[in-house]
């Protein structure tokens, strides 16, 4: 009987797209291999948000919560970055022998893993040094972080699973990219266009655009639209349930990879809420605009102009035009990723 193989999945603290895609990959791995134990290393908040999804994976999946609390995330104030909140997670992770010494490691956007585990497979469509570099001349901790991440990547040239539609220049240039299509789970039934009458205004989970989100939501509500936001204290905080996604006709958002993936899944056009200081957000917005999936990138649109764009996308007679580009999106990324891991780690041979 084959020995149970262990996999640790480390997940960046920034937003929910990271953990959502890793749950899909874990589910497909466990579907193929019964002798596989997967442990997620998450923040407490990620665990609470996705507890039921992880439990649904069965007894071969578990969680160590709190490990990645002190991992890099987007902050508008460069003075708020320290060595501790950029790299502190590494000490916590290394203290858990079960995590650090597992047979395999996937790290979603946390490059520091390569120091202990140069064999780790990275996952994500951008690298954190691309974003933090904007603050390198104002904060020594940021400069050290950027220099170290680039050095680790050049030394190890790791495999990195990335969305072929969104992969950044640094991912392509500094890693050995494994380009896959959109990571969409089971094919779901789409709602009739005429019934998709709600709007989601979403700041991307980083909390840096909350005031803008609230302003746009207020104006859309004044125009009698049903509006959800990602603000926890809002009267209509979005619950991310399938039945709620089915009601959404347009998403006004700072388009991170996670939000973009959900919009591709549900075929929901996006109106871009810009975050000009964040190079990742701007790059993704450009890519989505080129693909015809997002609108409003040109110029620096004010909230009234963004509201008008959202209204236009919600017009019944125009909805099909906005949705048409989504038909060109390939959605097999979960299977493609698992195929790669199965071959790269020789899992079929190990199972014999």
Outline where the language-model segments fall:
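Conserved nucleotide-sugar phosphate-binding/catalytic loop shared by glycosyltransferases and other
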Residues: 4, 11-13, 36-85
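Conserved nucleotide-sugar donor-binding subdomain of glycosyltransferases
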Residues: 71-113
């Amino acid at each position: 009987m084959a020995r149970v193989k262990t996999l640790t999945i480390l997940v960046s603290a920034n937003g929910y797209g990271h953990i959502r895609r890793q749950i899909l990959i874990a589910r497909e791995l466990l579907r193929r291999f019964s002798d596989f134990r997967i442990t997620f290393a998450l923040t407490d908040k990620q665990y609470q948000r996705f507890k039921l999804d992880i439990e649904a994976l069965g007894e071969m999946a578990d969680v160590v919560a709190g490990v990645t609390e002190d991992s890099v995330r987007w902050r508008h104030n460069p003075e708020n970055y320290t060595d501790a909140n950029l790299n502190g997670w590494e000490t916590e992770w290394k203290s858990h022998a079960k995590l650090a010494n597992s047979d395999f490691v996937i790290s979603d956007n946390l490059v520091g893993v390569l120091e202990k585990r140069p064999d780790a497979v990275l996952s994500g469509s951008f690298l954190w040094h691309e974003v933090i570099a904007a603050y390198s001349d104002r904060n020594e901790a940021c400069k050290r972080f950027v220099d170290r991440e680039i050095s680790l990547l050049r030394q190890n040239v790791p495999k990195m699973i990335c969305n072929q539609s969104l992969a950044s220049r640094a991912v392509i240039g500094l890693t050995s990219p494994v380009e896959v299509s959109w990571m969409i789970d089971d094919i779901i039934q789409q709602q009739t266009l005429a019934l998709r009458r709600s709007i989601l205004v979403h700041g991307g989970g980083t909390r840096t655009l909350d005031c803008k989100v609230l302003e746009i939501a207020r104006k859309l509500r004044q125009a009698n639209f049903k509006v959800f936001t990602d603000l926890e204290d809002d009267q209509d905080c979005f619950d991310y349930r399938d039945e709620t996604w089915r009601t959404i006709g347009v998403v006004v958002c700072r388009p991170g990879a996670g939000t973009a993936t959900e919009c591709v899944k549900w075929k929901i056009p996006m109106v871009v809420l810009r975050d000009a200081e964040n190079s990742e957000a701007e790059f993704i917005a450009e890519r989505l605009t080129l693909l015809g999936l997002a609108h409003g990138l040109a110029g620096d649109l004010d909230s009234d102009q963004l509201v008008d764009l959202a209204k236009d996308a919600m017009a019944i007679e125009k909805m099909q035009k906005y949705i048409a580009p989504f038909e060109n999106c390939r959605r097999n990324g979960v299977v493609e990723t698992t195929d790669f891991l199965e071959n790269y780690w020789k899992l079929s041979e190990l199972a014999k």
